[in-house]
Design a protein with these regions (language model features):
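PRPP-associated nucleotide enzymes
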Residues: 1-152
Length: 152
């Protein structure tokens, strides 16, 4: 089995903005897979991201909804002083500090990040963005710009 045989494009329905989706069978997302192997890969990612002393730095891990939330949760466990948060497509309550950003290619383009502890972001030495796929990086850049505008 070659290194990319677990990847394939699938046809999407009901999304005129994005005709295909990249499916990674090792993620157990959109396609059945081996959960033990999937979790082991998430743990490997967490270990790699925490190398060279990075695991000891104050960290914010942000996982993109909905499909990267499990990956982000596992990754965040490898950082000693970590604040973990996920984005959401749901409208947040009025008491929440919500940072809005867009995922242009999505069927539901408006996303939010609920920031309950702004100081966690200000204290962080590093912020790690976790998604199930980065194709253009546009969504990540949209979030970074929104964070910079709200938490600077």
């Amino acid at each position: 089995m070659n290194e990319t045989s677990h990847l394939f494009l699938a046809k999407r329905e009901n999304n005129p903005l994005r005709e295909n989706i990249l499916v990674n069978t090792r993620q157990c997302k959109h396609f059945p897979g081996d959960p033990e192997r999937s979790i082991a890969l998430m743990e490997e990612l967490g270990r790699k991201l925490g190398q060279d002393g990075r695991a000891d730095k104050t960290t914010v891990v942000i996982a993109f909804a909905e499909t990267a939330t499990a990956i982000g949760a596992v990754v965040s466990g490898f950082f000693h002083d970590c604040f973990f948060v996920t984005t959401t497509r749901e409208k947040l309550p009025d008491w929440a500090t919500a940072i809005g950003f867009e995922e242009q290619h999505s069927h539901a383009p408006q996303h939010y990040l609920c920031v309950r502890d702004e100081d966690a972001f200000r204290r962080a030495a590093q912020v790690i963005l976790v998604d199930d796929e980065f194709t253009t990086g546009r969504t990540a850049m949209n979030l970074i710009r929104a964070l910079d505008g709200c938490l600077a």
